[in-house]
Amino acid sequence: METLETEKFFSDDKPLLKPISDHSEIKTKARRNAVVSVLIQPFQWLQMLSSRLNLSFVLGVVLVYGVNQGFSGSIFKVVTDYYWKDVQQVQPSVVQLYMGLYYIPWVMRPIWGLFTDVFPIKGYKRKPYFVVSGVLGLVSAIAIVVLGKLPAALALSCLLGVSAAMAIADVVIDACIATNSINIRSLAPDIQSLCMVCSSAGALVGYATSGVFVHQLGPQGALGVLAFSPATIVILGFFIYEKRSSTVPTQKTKKDTDGLGVAVKGMCKTVKYPEVWKPSLYMFISLALNISTHEGHFYWYTDPTAGPAFSQEFVGIIYAVGALASMFGVLIYHKKLKGYSFRNILFFAQLLYVFSGMLDLVFIKRWNLTLGIPDSLFVITEESFTKMISKIRWIPMVVLSTRLCPLGIEGTFFAFLMCIDSFGQLASKWGGGFVLHAFGVTRHDFGNLWLVILIRNILRLVTVCFVFLVPDSDHLDDLVPSDVLPKKQSEDDDDDDIKLLLL
């Protein structure tokens, strides 16, 4: 009897083990599904953007921001640093001044914006400017490689041509970005996230390969890689679809003149609104007060006596890791921060930016070695944190800029706001060059570099005092009155959506 009861007891227990096993399988399957969900989320996000904005617009952003700005821009930064240092043998403070000149074509973005908005060529407003941009960049990049060692002024002119090509292509695609951000305002943060992801991904590839290019081809030969991006922009200009204007030739001049007048009046009227000029002023202050010490850092990085003497390949790796961290910054903003007000995000991001600047000071003073942290580990950690915070700090300002653009002159006005950004960066480069020169930082003397960095960090802290200029609103709020432009619009306005011609 007892044996039968025991057998029954154990036989009754056996089914109890099965649900536990099933539960374990369910948990394993859930974890697997979660991993798959995370992996396919970016593709679902791209599909959503393509369906709501159209695939051609997304591809246009990938080409201009990913290849033109990200990849080519990162190659430009690293290779030109070595070019001025090793080929032209220029002092770091002078290179800072040259780098400021690179921003002149970007300062001229309102002019490029006016051309794309009101001066179509052969009935097209976008296609011809892509071609012009690509040809200019292609010729400039090839010239600086083929002509050998050029005088500094001529070499600077070629590099300015490459920079101008990037700026023109950027303006053309930004006009479309501003239009879509206005028409579908809920997607404005997503569009900027797409831009930043493409830019960071392209920069990651560019930085990762830049050191190898410099090592294998030399600083001057590596500049030839800059011809790749404008070549793709030329092809894009020929194969992109755009609806041709139906305006007859006899009416063209009058239409262009009227359009120019409307654009200028709209800009003047818009910029007078406090909701517009206050955040624009903050954007300039936050960039201008953040004086650049990049060339001082770069010369110190690669100096075998005073600095850690990083190799060309490792310098590229540092920047590549920074680009990867930028992508994490975009992800953090997109997932966690885009619902907060512009003012709150910028306030806390600026405070973290001050802290990241103090890490530079620790590295220059070599306190990291006292703490037992190797130079390579510390610089990669510092670069990652700085780039991530920089991106979180920058995206809200760009999103805010798109919300300040009145419909009808969005290309021109967005270019105007980005021109303010370029002025700020130019002031940052020249201000940093002046301070480096004033404190006697040269190719081989870095004794006062830590003082320059300390001054820069203090100025970053001062910037926090101006955050009140930023509106305490989010990306869904109306910032610009709807009556900025006259209501009369041309009936045959071109469709600004970029559509790739499917072959």
From Swiss-Prot:
InterPro entries: BT1, FBT, MFS_trans_sf. One of its GO terms (cellular component) is membrane. It is a multi-pass membrane protein. The keyword Chaperone does not apply. It is found in: Membrane. It holds the Pfam family BT1. The chain crosses the membrane at residues 56-76, 101-121, 128-148, 153-173, 194-214, 221-241, 281-301, 314-334, 344-364, 369-389, 404-424, 450-470. Gene3D superfamilies: MFS general substrate transporter like domains (1.20.1250.20). The keyword Transmembrane applies. Belongs to the major facilitator superfamily. Folate-biopterin transporter (TC 2.A.71) family. This is Probable folate-biopterin transporter 6.
